[in-house]
Design a protein with these regions (language model features):
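Intrinsic-disorder-associated, low-complexity terminal segments enriched in Asp/Asn/His/Tyr and depleted
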Residues: 2-4, 19, 25
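Residue-level recognition of conserved structural "scaffold" positions that shape functional pockets
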Residues: 17, 25-27, 167, 228
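Short, Lys/Arg-enriched N-terminal segments with co-localized hydrophobic residues
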Residues: 23-36
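Conserved alpha-helical scaffold segments that buttress catalytic/binding sites
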Residues: 34-84, 89-426
Length: 426
């Protein structure tokens, strides 16, 4: 039996909404303290080296709209919605080190594309030079991303190796609340010697990082024959999620709630099948299709929770006819389109206008409460925190879900996502 009504915002005050930093509510607001911080900011970057794009057809290109860091000009960051930048460091990518030169290869195709129709101010900061050590590169990336987040700008990072997930995650420390991460990777990048960081084990450093703000983690697209069963078992014990490639291919729409819940999303392009993206030493005959990649990129951009995203491991040295660079550029285009079309849903708004659906369940658990946004038709479910009196969490947490999970609960089954979240809150 179900009922629906308008949600009373006073009764539902999810942790994310109450603790969302004020700086993130006014996108583009540039606090005065950042003016002097930016004095040496662009010294970290090599200016953009993208070629001039012919406009003989009279059609605007991204090259005409983006504010790029050039040798003779710097972009205005005040009011910017998105900031792209590259990282010229692939030293921890092993035999895929050529990914260090990916940013310019991707820009070459991105700048030729027609901009999304709802274009918003976007900057291209240029490329962070490889530091004297890999840790120096990490420090530069972390400081840039942290400043962008505090300024209300969404950074999209073009790597470089997938190990750059580490400084992106560290940059979130300044936000000071529990964080959710999604990686898209054909492997689970754990294991090995944690003291020797590489693009194949960088998640060790993320999970063990202090202070530990990691609340939820999911990997999308792993392939069973590339995955250590012990790592899968570890993720299950931690109430984290690993979604197989087959599940993604069967229904890409089921991945949308996963990325909607993420503050940070990073993609290893080896998750794309080699026939669509050959430019990685780890490219495999199996993987996401080009269409899945672009759809996923749009889902990532559409998330109102997104703080930073990155696409890594593209190796121009292995790119047959630049097909891989074209695809990554198209993925960035879809991510931009998603960001420009965010709906301002939870956690950026009150849920007072959401529809509330109460589903009665048999057994000790009497009901699950679902919410539906009238702006986007997207769904959330309310997960109570059993020991909230002893913690800093509110009495419940709104977790993104799909309509199918609402149907599953209506038929008497407890959704896995609800149970995993409940276990973590307990």
């Amino acid at each position: 039996m179900h009922s629906h009504s308008v949600v009373n915002a006073c009764l539902v005050a999810p942790y994310e909404l109450r603790h969302w930093p004020a700086t993130l509510h006014s996108k583009g607001a540039l606090a005065p303290k950042f003016w002097f911080m930016l004095d040496g900011f662009f010294d970290l970057f090599e200016p953009v080296n993208a070629p001039d794009i012919s406009n003989a057809e009279g059609v605007a290109r991204i090259a005409d709209r983006i504010e790029a860091h050039r040798f003779d000009a710097r972009p205005m960051l005040e009011g910017a919605r998105v900031a792209l930048f590259g990282v010229n460091d692939g030293r921890r990518s092993g035999d895929n080190e050529g990914c260090a030169s990916a940013p310019d290869a991707i820009r070459n195709w991105l700048y030729q594309l027609v901009p999304p129709s709802d274009w918003q101010p976007t900057a291209d900061l240029g490329d962070i030079r490889a530091g004297a050590t890999e840790d120096d590169t990490y420090a530069a990336v972390q400081s840039v991303v942290a400043e962008m987040i505090q300024m209300g700008i969404v950074p999209i990072v073009l790597g470089g190796g997938h190990d750059l997930t580490i400084p992106l995650y560290r940059a979130l420390d300044s936000v000071g609340r529990p964080m959710n991460i999604v990686t898209v990777d054909p492997r689970l990048d754990f294991g090995g010697d944690p003291s020797i960081i590489s693009s194949r084990n960088h998640m060790n450093s993320v999970v063990m990082h202090e202070p530990n703000y990691l609340f939820d983690y999911a990997n999308v697209g792993h392939q069973g024959y590339l995955t250590d069963p012990d790592t899968l078992e570890l993720l299950e014990r931690l109430q984290f999620e690993a979604i197989r490639l087959g599940n993604l291919l069967q229904n890409i729409q089921q991945i949308e709630p996963v990325v909607r819940n993420a503050d940070l999303v990073t993609i290893d392009v080896a998750a794309i099948r080699a026939s669509d993206h050959p430019a990685s030493t780890h490219a495999s005959p199996n993987g996401m299709t080009a269409e899945h990649f672009c759809q996923l990129a749009r889902y990532i951009g559409m998330s109102d929770r997104l703080l930073v995203s990155g696409i890594f491991e593209h190796n121009p040295n292995l790119d047959d006819r630049s097909r891989g660079a074209q695809l990554v550029a198209q993925g960035v285009w879809h991510m931009l389109e998603g960001i420009f079309n965010q709906k301002g849903d939870h956690p950026k708004c009150s849920t007072e206008d959401y529809l509330k659906y109460v589903v009665d369940l048999p057994g000790e658990l009497h009901e699950i409460v679902f919410y539906k946004s009238p702006k986007s038709d997207r769904w959330w479910m309310d997960v109570p925190a059993p020991n909230h009196e002893k913690s800093k969490l509110s009495s419940s947490l709104l977790v993104p879900c799909s309509y199918d999970e609402y149907v599953e609960a209506s038929e008497g089954s407890l959704p896995d996502r609800w149970w995993r979240t409940y276990q973590k809150l307990a």
